Curated annotation (Swiss-Prot):
Any Gene Ontology CC annotation: cytoplasm
Keywords on record: Metal-binding
Organism expressing this protein natively: Pasteurella multocida (strain Pm70)
Quaternary structure, from the entry: Homohexamer.
Name by which UniProt lists this protein: GTP cyclohydrolase 1 type 2 homolog
Coiled-coil zones: none
Binding site for a divalent metal cation 2: H64, H219, E223
Metal-binding among keywords: yes
InterPro entries, per the entry: DUF34/NIF3, DUF34/NIF3_sf
C-alpha cells in the first residue's frame, strides 16, 4: 500500500480532520512509499523504533507521536536520535492522538470500556465531540471488585480513592491517559465512579468532596487498546501485516 494512501484511510476511519488537537495527526515522518509491514505501539519511543527496525517494518503507527505544540521544535538530542533512526531506515511514522481517544469503535475510551464491561457509552461534554464518556456497568460492583477487575484486565494495580462514595458502582466516567481533570464533569453528571490513567494532587480532593470513586490505572496501560484495535482493523481490511508491540511503561 502507498504511504499516502494509508494516511488517507486512517484519516477517514478516525475522522481526524474534525477534531482539534495539540499534535499533528497523520503521517508525521515520511519514509518509503510502499508499506507492507506496520508496527503499532502506544508511543514512538526509541525502543519501539528499534524494534520496528529489527522487524524490517515499513511503518510505525502510534497514539503518541511527535511535534506537540508545547515542545521544542529543534531536532536534536533524544528527538534527533529518534527521527534520525526513522529516516536512516526509511520508516514512516503515523501518529493519531485525540481522534484515537474518542473513536466510538476503536478508541481508547471505547476499548477500555468494553474490557471493563461498561456499556451504553454517552458523552460527558457538550458539542460535536466529547473526549470523556460515561456508561453503565453490566453488573454493579463494589470498589474493591471493580479495582480487581481493572487489575486483572490491565495487569497493574490501580490507585483507588473511594472515600465518601456510594457502596456500589453502577455508572462510570472514563477518560484514558491524562484525563483526571474531567472528574468534576463526571461528578456533575452524577456518575458513581471515574477512571483515568493519571492522578493529580487535587483529583483526590475532588473525589472525596464530591463522593465519587476514582481509579487511576496508568496512562500507558489505559491507552494500549485503541492503537492495538486500529492495527487489527487495518490487518482485517487491507493486505497489511500489522504487529502490536507493547513497550511497558509503569506511568
Amino acid at each position: 500500500m502507498n504511504a499516502l494512501e494509508l494516511e488517507q484511510i486512517l484519516n477517514h476511519k478516525l475522522n481526524s480532520q474534525a477534531i482539534s488537537d495539540y499534535a499533528p495527526n497523520g503521517l508525521q515522518v515520511e519514509g518509503k512509499k510502499d508499506i507492507k509491514k506496520i508496527i503499532t505501539g502506544v508511543t514512538a519511543s526509541q525502543a519501539l523504533i528499534e524494534y520496528a527496525v529489527s522487524q524490517n517494518a515499513d511503518a510505525i503507527l502510534v497514539h503518541h507521536g511527535y511535534f506537540w505544540k508545547s515542545e521544542n521544535p529543534c531536532i536534536r538530542g533524544m528527538k534527533g536520535k529518534r527521527i534520525k533512526t526513522l529516516l536512516v531506515n526509511d520508516i514512516n511514522l503515523y501518529g493519531y492522538h485525540l481522534p484515537l481517544d474518542v473513536h466510538p469503535e476503536l478508541g481508547n475510551n471505547a476499548r477500555l470500556a468494553a474490557l471493563l464491561e461498561i456499556e451504553d457509552l454517552q458523552p460527558l461534554e457538550q458539542g460535536t465531540v466529547s473526549i470523556p464518556v460515561y456508561g453503565t456497568l453490566k453488573t454493579p460492583l463494589t470498589s474493591d471488585a471493580f479495582a480487581a477487575r481493572i487489575e486483572q484486565v490491565l495487569k497493574r494495580k490501580p490507585l483507588v480513592c473511594s472515600d465518601n462514595a456510594p457502596h456500589l458502582i453502577r455508572t462510570v466516567g472514563i477518560c484514558t491517559g491524562g484525563g483526571q481533570s474531567y472528574i468534576d464533569l463526571a461528578a456533575n453528571q452524577g456518575v458513581d465512579a471515574f477512571i483515568s490513567g493519571e492522578v493529580s494532587e487535587q483529583t483526590i480532593h475532588s473525589a472525596r468532596e464530591q463522593g465519587i470513586h476514582f481509579f487511576a490505572a496508568g496512562h500507558h496501560a489505559t491507552e494500549r487498546y485503541g492503537i492495538k484495535a486500529l492495527g487489527e482493523w487495518l490487518s482485517q481490511h487491507y493486505d497489511l501485516e500489522v504487529e502490536f508491540k507493547d513497550i511497558d511503561n509503569p506511568a
